[in-house]
C-alpha cells in the first residue's frame, strides 16, 4: 500500500507593503525614514487645510498626538508584545505626572522645587518601581483576572488623586508646574518652552517618540523580545521550554510603566497644572483601543493607533451637522459626538480588519491559524 501526501499550497494574500520594503536596499529604507522624520519635524510649520478645522490649534494638536503615541508605544509593549491585558495603564501615566508635579511645583506639599529635567528621571524610576510592585504579586494571573487587577490599580490611583486632603489635592490639583528647560531662551530672551507656542513641546515629544521607537525596536529583536513573543503565543509551552516567563512579563510591565511615566511627566510639564480629572479610566480604554485598532504587537500599528485616537476627535471640532436634520440633531458640533463616531470607527475596523490597520506579521499568522481552526471545527 502506498500513501502519498500533498503539501498544501500557501495561502494567497494581497499586496503586502512589507515585501517591497524589506527587499529595498538598506540605504533607501534609511532615506525614507529620515525623510519621514524631517516631515514630522516640519509639520507644525505647515498649513495643511484638509488636516485641520476651525478652532483647532495645529501645533497643540500635534503635541497631543505625540503624547498619545508615547502611551500607545508603552502599552503596546505590555499588550502587543507580551500579551498581557492591561486596562489600568492610565495609572502609570498619573504616577509620572504627579511625581513631576510634587517634585517641581512650589504649590506642592513637598516644597522641593526641583528642575523639571531632574524630576523626569525620578518620575520614570517611580513608575517603573510601581510597575514592578503591581506586577510582582499579580503577573501569575492571566487574561481577564489580570485585566481586573490592573483596572483596580487605576481606580486606586484615581481615588487617591481625588482626595482633596491628600498631597494630590483632588480637583484643585497642583499648579505652577515648571515647563521643560526654562534656561533655554530665544533671541528676544523669552523662554523657548513658554505658554504661547506649542511647537517646542511637540518637537520635544517627537524626539522622545523616536527614542522610544528605537529602544523598543531593539528590545523586540533581542532575546527579551523573542521571549515576549513566546509568552504571548503560548505561555505554558514557553515555560516548558525553559523561558523564565514571570521575569520577562515583569520586564514588560516595568518597561511599559516607564514609558507611561515619561508621557505623564511630559504632559505635566507642558500643561503646568494637573488634577484628578486628567486621569480617568476612559483614557486607558482609548489608548488600548488605539493599540488594537492600529495593530497590536507592531510598532507602526501602535504609532498609527496613537495618532488616530488623538486626531479623529479633534478633526471633528468645528464641523457642524446639516441644519435640515430633525429635532436637536441639526447644526450641532460633531465634536460633541466624538465618542459615538469614534466608537463606530473602531467597530468597523474590528469587523473588516480585526488584525488592525497595520498588523504585525506574527499577528497576521496567528489570526490565519485561528481561522483554520474554526473552519476545521465546523
Predicted features and spans:
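Transmembrane alpha-helices and adjacent helix-loop boundaries
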Residues: 2-378
Amino acid at each position: 500500500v502506498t500513501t502519498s501526501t500533498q503539501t498544501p499550497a500557501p495561502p494567497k494574500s494581497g499586496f503586502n507593503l512589507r515585501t517591497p520594503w524589506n527587499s529595498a536596499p538598506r540605504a533607501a529604507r534609511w532615506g525614507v525614514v529620515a525623510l519621514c522624520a524631517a516631515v514630522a519635524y516640519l509639520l507644525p510649520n505647515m498649513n495643511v487645510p484638509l488636516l485641520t478645522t476651525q478652532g483647532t490649534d495645529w501645533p497643540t494638536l500635534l503635541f497631543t498626538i505625540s503624547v498619545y503615541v508615547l502611551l500607545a508605544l508603552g502599552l503596546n509593549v505590555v499588550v502587543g508584545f507580551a500579551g498581557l491585558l492591561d486596562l489600568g495603564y492610565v495609572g502609570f501615566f498619573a504616577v509620572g505626572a504627579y511625581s513631576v508635579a510634587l517634585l517641581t511645583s512650589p504649590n506642592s506639599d513637598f516644597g522641593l522645587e526641583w528642575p523639571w529635567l531632574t524630576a523626569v528621571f525620578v518620575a520614570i524610576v517611580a513608575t517603573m518601581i510601581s510597575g514592578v510592585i503591581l506586577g510582582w504579586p499579580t503577573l501569575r494571573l492571566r487574561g481577564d483576572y489580570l485585566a481586573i487587577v490592573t483596572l483596580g490599580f487605576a481606580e486606586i490611583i484615581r481615588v487617591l488623586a481625588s482626595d482633596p486632603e491628600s498631597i494630590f489635592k483632588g480637583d484643585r490639583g497642583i499648579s505652577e508646574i515648571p515647563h521643560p528647560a526654562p534656561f533655554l531662551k530665544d533671541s528676544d530672551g523669552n523662554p523657548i518652552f513658554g505658554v504661547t507656542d506649542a511647537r517646542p513641546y511637540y518637537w520635544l515629544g517627537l524626539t522622545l517618540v523616536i527614542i522610544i521607537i528605537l529602544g523598543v525596536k531593539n528590545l523586540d529583536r533581542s532575546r527579551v523580545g523573542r521571549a515576549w513573543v513566546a509568552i504571548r503565543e503560548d505561555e505554558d509551552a514557553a515555560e516548558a521550554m525553559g523561558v523564565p516567563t514571570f521575569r520577562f512579563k515583569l520586564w514588560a510591565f516595568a518597561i511599559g510603566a516607564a514609558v507611561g511615566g515619561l508621557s505623564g511627566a511630559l504632559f505635566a510639564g507642558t500643561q503646568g497644572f494637573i488634577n484628578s480629572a486628567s486621569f480617568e479610566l476612559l483614557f486607558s480604554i482609548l489608548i488600548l483601543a488605539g493599540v488594537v485598532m492600529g495593530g497590536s504587537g507592531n510598532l507602526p500599528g501602535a504609532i498609527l493607533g496613537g495618532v488616530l485616537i488623538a486626531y479623529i476627535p479633534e478633526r471633528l471640532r468645528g464641523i457642524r451637522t446639516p441644519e435640515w436634520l430633525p429635532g436637536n440633531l441639526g447644526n450641532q458640533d460633531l465634536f460633541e459626538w466624538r465618542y459615538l463616531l469614534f466608537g463606530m470607527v473602531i467597530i468597523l475596523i474590528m469587523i473588516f480588519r480585526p488584525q488592525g490597520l497595520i498588523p504585525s506579521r506574527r499577528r497576521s499568522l496567528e489570526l490565519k491559524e485561528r481561522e483554520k481552526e474554526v473552519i476545521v471545527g465546523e
